[in-house]
Amino acid sequence: MNKALVTLLLTLGITGLAHAAGDAAAGQGKAAVCGACHGPDGNSAAPNFPKLAGQGERYLLKQMQDIKAGTKPGAPEGSGRKVLEMTGMLDNFSDQDLADLAAYFTSQKPTVGAADPQLVEAGETLYRGGKLADGMPACTGCHSPNGEGNTPAAYPRLSGQHAQYVAKQLTDFREGARTNDGDNMIMRSIAAKLSNKDIAAISSYIQGLH
């Protein structure tokens, strides 16, 4: 096989694996269906629905793809991400649609939340220091000191996220109800080391982090 053909095949392979670029303007029109729960600009008013505004584009796209796969009728146990409230919501969206939605919500400005003053100290200790005696690293390593996350690595933005939603996700990771954190099970292994009090404190701290 000549070098030119090899190069062509490699190029086609790489192109086939690449995700379509999202169009924020197109995503705005497609986001109307999302507004009832997540707010028109991705800043949800209900504490059980996550804020999407300002979230990392790669992370948002992956979560939507996982939720679409995990909520399909007959989806194998452990596949994707199962979110009961999202059942059927993404079925008619193409990969390009999802990319456009991710681009739109990423472009929106997130609102700032507030932490419970009584939980700030405990939450800050966990977020910035982890529980080293138990082998739990600080959250700052992946999610950054100010909670902005790591966009290239698809680690989510946490800053200002609703405490109720964060607590639910940590609990789900701890109990194995959410499993889309990769083969290394990083969030499941971390959440396994958190008590209910730990989860309440760190979730509240994250809500006020900015």
UniProtKB/Swiss-Prot annotation:
Keywords: Electron transport, Heme, Iron, Metal-binding, Periplasm, Signal, Transport. It is found in: Periplasm. Pfam families: Cytochrom_C. GO terms for cellular component: periplasmic space. Heme c 2 binds at C139, C142, H143, M187. Heme c 1 binds at C34, C37, H38, M86. One of its GO terms (molecular function) is electron transfer activity. PANTHER family: CBB3-TYPE CYTOCHROME C OXIDASE SUBUNIT FIXP, CYTOCHROME C4. Diheme, high potential cytochrome c believed to be an intermediate electron donor to terminal oxidation systems. This is Cytochrome c4.
